[in-house]
């Protein structure tokens, strides 16, 4: 059940385009301690004015519980999502539980968690969605509807989390490798 009680104090934190959920957690953790101290001081001083949560919502906005996150919920949908949607999906699940995908590399299918990515603008229409473009040294780009997603940090099943440059030292993509 959602906490619908009155709000006695709050602080807003900007979420940068590069922040992942771990970064936001850390920002809130630092501010939370200060806010608790400040709130207790204001309660003691009698300067708190509680505000109903409904009064804080924009017109037509409704509080909804966050959905439960399951393993399948964390799978990257390369086919039906835009570059920004995929990028935000990865950020929203990093570092835990992490977005994941399947790598089809030749006749092998490997589960891969994606922890960090970047948006890369460009015309991706020449490639099937999910196609991996790599220089075999330091870059993994994935063709999506409206551009590319550059993978920066990943974890192959059974291995440790690593930067793409480290991953590429010991891995070779097959000719038609793709994420699906």
Model features per residue range: what roles?
Residues 1-65:
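Donor/substrate-binding cores of folate-linked one-carbon enzymes
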Residues 58-180:
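Internal anion-binding site segments
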């Amino acid at each position: 059940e959602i906490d619908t009680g009155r709000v006695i104090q709050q602080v807003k934190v900007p979420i940068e385009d590069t922040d992942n959920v771990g970064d936001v957690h850390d920002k809130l953790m630092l501010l939370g301690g200060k806010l608790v101290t400040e709130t207790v001081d204001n309660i003691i001083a009698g300067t708190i004015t509680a505000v109903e949560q409904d009064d804080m919502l924009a017109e037509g906005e409704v509080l909804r519980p966050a959905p439960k996150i399951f393993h399948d919920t964390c799978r990257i949908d390369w086919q039906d999502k835009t570059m920004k949607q995929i990028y935000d999906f990865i950020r929203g699940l990093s570092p835990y539980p992490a977005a994941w995908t399947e790598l089809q590399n030749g006749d092998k299918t490997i589960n891969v968690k994606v922890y960090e990515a970047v948006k890369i603008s460009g015309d991706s229409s020449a490639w099937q969605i999910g196609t991996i473009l790599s220089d075999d040294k330091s870059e993994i780009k994935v063709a999506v509807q409206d551009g590319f997603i550059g993978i920066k940090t990943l974890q192959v099943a059974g291995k440790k989390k690593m930067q793409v440059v480290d991953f590429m030292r010991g891995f070779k993509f097959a000719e038609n490798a793709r994420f699906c």
